[in-house]
């Protein structure tokens, strides 16, 4: 069985920064250059009074007072830029339209007109081949020597070895037979004692 993996192309990530992709005009602090869907309202006290008096008390909700200071809330909402997804990201705050207290107003000018392109490709192939080599296994099987299995009663004195225990059959009833059995019995007892101790 063989396993081969061929990876032709590792994942490659290429990043490129491109400019001027946004279709909207870049925002400036002066508020002169704005997108097509942006709107501004002059946040003065007179306009705020007209706005609040034009609504009935039942129609005034949480969106009309986003903070504890109504004038600050109106200034925050009027300075917010309305834009769509195609116009990019732009936030403008004009210095001329700030209230005299400067409470709750932060001057922000932010434009995002950069992007990152990523490309990742992975091409790989895996091939598995299972070829059984039967001829080699047969030759290995023939070259092995087959030894007899040890019988359960092989430690007894009346157990007689036959010619298959040796290569040329010369160990049948030899003088070392009883010494061999005695040694094997002692080794077996030592092994059993070690197993019990563990």
Swiss-Prot record:
<feature type="modified residue" description="Phosphoserine; by host CK1">
    <location>
        <position position="67"/>
    </location>
</feature>
<feature type="compositionally biased region" description="Acidic residues">
    <location>
        <begin position="153"/>
        <end position="166"/>
    </location>
</feature>
<dbReference type="Pfam" id="PF01525">
    <property type="entry name" value="Rota_NS26"/>
</dbReference>
<protein>
    <recommendedName>
        <fullName>Non-structural protein 5</fullName>
    </recommendedName>
</protein>
<dbReference type="GO" id="GO:0003723">
    <property type="term" value="F:RNA binding"/>
</dbReference>
<dbReference type="GO" id="GO:0030430">
    <property type="term" value="C:host cell cytoplasm"/>
</dbReference>
<keyword id="KW-0597">Phosphoprotein</keyword>
<keyword id="KW-0694">RNA-binding</keyword>
<feature type="region of interest" description="Disordered">
    <location>
        <begin position="16"/>
        <end position="37"/>
    </location>
</feature>
<feature type="binding site">
    <location>
        <position position="92"/>
    </location>
    <ligand>
        <name>Mg(2+)</name>
    </ligand>
</feature>
<comment type="similarity">
    <text>Belongs to the rotavirus NSP5 family.</text>
</comment>
<dbReference type="GO" id="GO:0000166">
    <property type="term" value="F:nucleotide binding"/>
</dbReference>
<keyword id="KW-0479">Metal-binding</keyword>
<comment type="function">
    <text>Plays an essential role in the viral genome replication. Participates, together with NSP2, in the formation of viral factories (viroplasms), which are large inclusions in the host cytoplasm where replication intermediates are assembled and viral RNA replication takes place. Orchestrates the recruitment of viroplasmic proteins such as capsid proteins to these factories. Participates in the selective exclusion of host proteins from stress granules (SG) and P bodies (PB). Also participates in the sequestration of these remodeled organelles in viral factories.</text>
</comment>
<feature type="modified residue" description="Phosphoserine; by host">
    <location>
        <position position="164"/>
    </location>
</feature>
<dbReference type="InterPro" id="IPR002512">
    <property type="entry name" value="Rotavirus_A/C_NSP5"/>
</dbReference>
<feature type="compositionally biased region" description="Low complexity">
    <location>
        <begin position="16"/>
        <end position="30"/>
    </location>
</feature>
<feature type="modified residue" description="Phosphoserine; by host">
    <location>
        <position position="154"/>
    </location>
</feature>
<keyword id="KW-0325">Glycoprotein</keyword>
<feature type="modified residue" description="Phosphoserine; by host">
    <location>
        <position position="156"/>
    </location>
</feature>
<keyword id="KW-0547">Nucleotide-binding</keyword>
<feature type="region of interest" description="Disordered">
    <location>
        <begin position="85"/>
        <end position="104"/>
    </location>
</feature>
<feature type="region of interest" description="Disordered">
    <location>
        <begin position="130"/>
        <end position="167"/>
    </location>
</feature>
<feature type="region of interest" description="Disordered">
    <location>
        <begin position="53"/>
        <end position="72"/>
    </location>
</feature>
<dbReference type="GO" id="GO:0000287">
    <property type="term" value="F:magnesium ion binding"/>
</dbReference>
<keyword id="KW-1035">Host cytoplasm</keyword>
<feature type="modified residue" description="Phosphoserine; by host">
    <location>
        <position position="166"/>
    </location>
</feature>
<comment type="subunit">
    <text>Homodimer. Interacts with VP1. Interacts with VP2. Interacts with NSP2; this interaction leads to up-regulation of NSP5 hyperphosphorylation and formation of virus factories. Interacts with NSP6. Participates in the selective exclusion of host proteins from stress granules (SG) and P bodies (PB). Also participates in the sequestration of these remodeled organelles in viral factories.</text>
</comment>
<dbReference type="GO" id="GO:0019079">
    <property type="term" value="P:viral genome replication"/>
</dbReference>
<keyword id="KW-0460">Magnesium</keyword>
<feature type="compositionally biased region" description="Polar residues">
    <location>
        <begin position="91"/>
        <end position="104"/>
    </location>
</feature>
<dbReference type="GO" id="GO:0016887">
    <property type="term" value="F:ATP hydrolysis activity"/>
</dbReference>
């Amino acid at each position: 069985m063989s396993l081969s993996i061929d990876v032709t192309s590792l994942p490659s990530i290429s990043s490129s920064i491109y400019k001027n992709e946004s279709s909207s005009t870049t925002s400036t602090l002066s508020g002169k250059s704005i997108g097509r869907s942006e709107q501004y309202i002059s946040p003065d006290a007179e306009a705020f009074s007209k706005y609040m008096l034009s609504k009935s008390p039942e129609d005034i909700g949480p969106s009309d007072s986003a903070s504890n200071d109504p004038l600050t809330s109106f200034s925050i909402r009027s300075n917010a830029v309305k834009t769509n997804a195609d116009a990019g990201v732009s936030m403008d705050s004009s210095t001329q339209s700030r209230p005299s207290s400067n409470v709750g107003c932060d001057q922000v000018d932010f434009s995002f007109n950069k992007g990152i392109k990523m490309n990742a490709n992975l091409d790989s192939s895996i091939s598995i081949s299972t070829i059984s080599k039967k001829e080699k296994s047969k030759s290995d099987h023939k070259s092995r020597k087959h030894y007899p299995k040890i019988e359960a009663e092989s430690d007894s004195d009346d157990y007689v070895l036959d010619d298959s225990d040796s290569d040329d059959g010369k160990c049948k009833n030899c003088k070392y037979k009883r010494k061999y059995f005695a040694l094997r019995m002692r080794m077996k007892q030592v092994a059993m004692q070690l197993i019990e101790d563990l």
